[in-house]
């Protein structure tokens, strides 16, 4: 399990400043709380499930850290506070501006927001090290209304990011939610996966990024086959 934590725009449920809310979208409550995980309840529930299913499956406890450079100290503190088995490192915002709402992209050119995204990601992996894999590395593609920005223009930044990840002994995630979002390429792209392999990267995990039970495990076998086609054999 890797529930989300996004310090910056989101607060912990017990933050003394109180809980923030946003208006609910269709199918949601009228007001939606902008909070991170209730960590004590989260880990308690995982322990209960481990006990219940111990003869059937191994249940691991993790989180997805949505890190920004300025929020790194909060994640350092959180990492020291609980017994994690696995951490996905992602960025979902830059400067506390969301990608999924196009808040970050607004007022910027396609070049500016793509380069800005990867510069922030590079800064994060250079300065934060308590994680297992880098999640949905080219997330910005999902929310790029102009289409896919040319790989070759981003290759120098992508190379530095991947070199840093590899030198740190970390891996990257193949995220199969590209199917849900109607993307034609893998996440990250095949070009990024080829570059990772060329640079000596070997650690890859596959995740379905499940936010609903019907998403669980979707396209995992497909991702394995695509990785084999790219030369990943272990």
Task: Identify the residue ranges that each predicted region occupies.
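An N-terminally biased module of ancient metal coordination in phosphate/nucleic-acid-related enzymes
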Residues: 1-65, 143, 150-152, 212-213, ...
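Charged catalytic cores and adjacent phosphate/nucleic-acid-binding surfaces used
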Residues: 11-15, 125-126, 141, 148-234
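Alpha-helix N-cap and loop-to-helix initiation/capping positions
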Residues: 30-41, 105-116, 149-156, 184-188, ...
